[in-house]
Design a protein with these regions (language model features):
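Beta-rich carbohydrate-recognition and catalytic domains
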Residues: 1-134, 142-188, 192-242, 251-305, ...
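Active-site lining segments of carbohydrate-active enzymes
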Residues: 139
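C-terminal substrate/ligand-recognition segments
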Residues: 313, 317
Length: 352
């Protein structure tokens, strides 16, 4: 496996203790998978912040949003025979699944792309309504014709789907509800229309026939989506054998639309790879990396809340046109940064 990422020497850039909890009595357990954008001359991250109550001995407790958008705390005895708690992220109690944390989205910004702080007078984004009672996660940001499109994972006991909000000033948001129903996530909208049409990558999942594959859809307005095509599947015996999912908005190059994506194997190791779509018809994938371009190797990527993970859904293409700076979640606990050469990634692609 070839790792071509140039990690920031300052990593991790953000840790759970760098940001205060949203509510008294909660603690931040994880900072994850930021969306990335530029605004007012600064680099901004919209970070997923996962919180839970401070834990008591022999008790598992976790927060849930009510339909009236208040937080309620559920407590379960660890010895309860109806509790299944084999995964740090999800538990099952009396046949129902619950997340062990509640996530919202927090804005931070930086003048240098390395040192981030919370600006004043910019709101956090939180779950709203019955489709987001378990929170909102993993926001991707696309800037299209002066408007920012925010796609994120909406989670509730109804399932996991894709929500959309739009903004021009990051203080006022228009809510468009759930644009892709359960079970779906990893939605990345292209930052340019192709032949007058919006396109987006997304990842529906099937528990029976099919799998965790990357699909593409089109839209006349960026809100209502259809014309779905499955374009990237898992590969048996390789690093992305269990699941694949889109990263951030595809990068336009002379050779095609370049997408940096995540893949995981049966051991739940998450790495990054890349594939290339046709410039005029992105439903056609024309090349893909065989090996990953980034593998969890640093200590902060291997050890954490859920270790052995690198996961990105945000990047910036630098002015030189070749350097792409990604911001990524490491071991489901830290926010980090790394740089790639677009030309080097393109050189590793194999035609399909």
């Amino acid at each position: 496996m070839k790792d071509i990422a140039k990690r920031f020497a300052e990593n991790p850039l953000l840790s759970p203790n760098n940001i205060p909890p949203s509510t008294e009595g909660l603690e931040i357990t994880c900072l994850l998978n930021p969306g990335v954008f530029q605004f007012k001359g600064k680099t901004w991250l919209i970070v997923r912040v996962a919180e839970r109550p401070k834990q008591k001995d022999n008790i598992i407790s976790f927060p849930v949003l009510t339909e009236t958008e208040n937080i309620t705390i559920i407590e379960i005895d660890k010895n309860d025979p109806e509790l299944i708690a084999d995964d740090a992220r999800v538990i099952n109690y009396k046949g129902n699944d619950y997340l062990t944390t509640l996530s919202h989205l927090r804005l931070v910004c930086s003048d240098d792309g390395t040192n981030f702080y919370e600006p004043e007078d910019y709101p956090s984004l939180v779950g709203e309504g019955i489709l987001e009672t378990f929170g909102i996660e993993d926001c991707r940001v696309a800037l299209i014709e002066g408007k920012y499109f925010l796609t994120f994972t909406s989670v509730s006991d109804n399932g996991v789907g894709v929500g959309l909000r739009t903004t021009t000033d990051w203080k006022n948001f228009e809510k468009h509800g759930m644009i892709l129903p359960a079970h779906n996530k990893d939605c990345a909208i292209f930052e340019e229309k192709i032949n007058g049409v919006f396109y987006a990558l997304h990842r529906p999942s099937s528990v029976d026939i099919g799998g965790n594959y990357i699909w593409i859809a089109s839209s006349p307005d960026g809100i209502h989506w259809g014309n779905h095509h499955c374009i990237v599947k898992t590969r048996k015996g390789l690093w992305d054998s269990k699941r694949v999912g889109a990263g951030a908005a595809p990068i336009k190059t002379a050779k095609g639309w370049l997408e940096i994506y995540h893949g995981a194997n049966e051991n739940h190791q998450y790495c990054l790879g890349a594939f290339l779509m046709d410039l005029n018809d992105p439903t056609k994938v024309i090349a893909r990396t065989e090996a990953p371009i980034m593998v969890p190797t640093a200590e902060y990527e291997i050890s954490g809340f859920f270790g052995n993970v690198v996961f990105t859904n945000g990047h910036i293409v630098e002015p030189d046109g070749d350097t792409v700076t990604i911001y990524y979640g490491a071991s489901d606990e830290f926010v980090c940064g790394a740089k790639f050469s677009i030309n080097e990634i393109l050189s590793l692609l194999k035609e399909i």
